[in-house]
Amino acid sequence: MSQPMTVDCPTCGAPVEWGEKSPFRPFCSDRCKLIDLGAWAAEEHKIAGAEESEDELYSGDLEPRH
């Protein structure tokens, strides 16, 4: 029988078995999952792409408010 696949937790680096026994996969725990979510919410992680400011995206689309 082959060994189960393992991955490293993206937050702490601990080995995580990829299977039903690991409900938080790819994270090792709920704590590591929430740390990662907090980093996304704080904009510490970003998806690569062109840098565009919000003003450039919507500058001509909306009427000014008075």
UniProtKB/Swiss-Prot annotation:
Key words of the record: Metal-binding, Zinc
Q: Name one Pfam family in it.
A: YacG
Biological processes per GO annotation: regulation of DNA-templated transcription
User: Where does this protein hold Zn(2+)?
Assistant: 9, 12, 28, 32
Q: How is the cofactor bound?
A: Binds 1 zinc ion.
In residue numbers, the region (Disordered) covers 45-66
- Is Metal-binding among this UniProt entry's keywords? yes
Cofactor requirements of the protein:
Zn(2+)
Q: Name one GO molecular function term.
A: DNA topoisomerase type II (double strand cut, ATP-hydrolyzing) inhibitor activity
Explain the purpose of this protein. Inhibits all the catalytic activities of DNA gyrase by preventing its interaction with DNA. Acts by binding directly to the C-terminal domain of GyrB, which probably disrupts DNA binding by the gyrase.
Oligomer and partners: Interacts with GyrB.
Q: Which family does it belong to?
A: Belongs to the DNA gyrase inhibitor YacG family.
User: Which protein is depicted?
Assistant: DNA gyrase inhibitor YacG
Which species does the entry assign this protein to? Pseudomonas entomophila (strain L48)
The top of its lineage is: Bacteria, Pseudomonadati, Pseudomonadota, Gammaproteobacteria, Pseudomonadales
